[in-house]
Amino acid sequence: MKHHAKDNTIADVAVGDSAELTWHVTHEEISAFAALSGDYNPLHVDPKYAFSVGFNAQVVHGFLVGAKISGLLGMQLPGRRCLLLDQSLSYPNPLYPDDRATIRLEIQSIHEDM
C-alpha cells in the first residue's frame, strides 16, 4: 500500500486550516507500539494490572497519540514539507482500547523564516 503525503507549500496553507483524524484504538496498535517503543509498562499491556490500580482497562500509551499527531502533520497538514520541531502534550483523561479518538489540528500561526 502506498501512502501519499500532501505537498502543500506555505502558500497553500492559512491560519485556520485544519485536519482531523478519528480512529478506533485497537489492542493490536497498543501491542505494536509497546514492541516499537520498548514500553511494556503493565499499565499499557496488562488489563488486570491497570484495573487493579484504578483504571477501567489498560491505558493507551500517550506517545501512541503523539505518533498519530505526527502522522496527521506529515501526511495531511501541512504534509510532506512538515518537520515537527516541538510538541507539548497533556492527557487529561485516559484513552482505552476500543475507544474512538479524534485528533484535530488547526494552524494558529505561520512562520515563514524556516
Show which residues each predicted segment covers:
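Hot-dog-fold acyl-thioester-processing enzymes
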Residues: 1-82
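Hydrophobic beta-sheet segments that form the core/acyl-binding groove
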Residues: 82-114
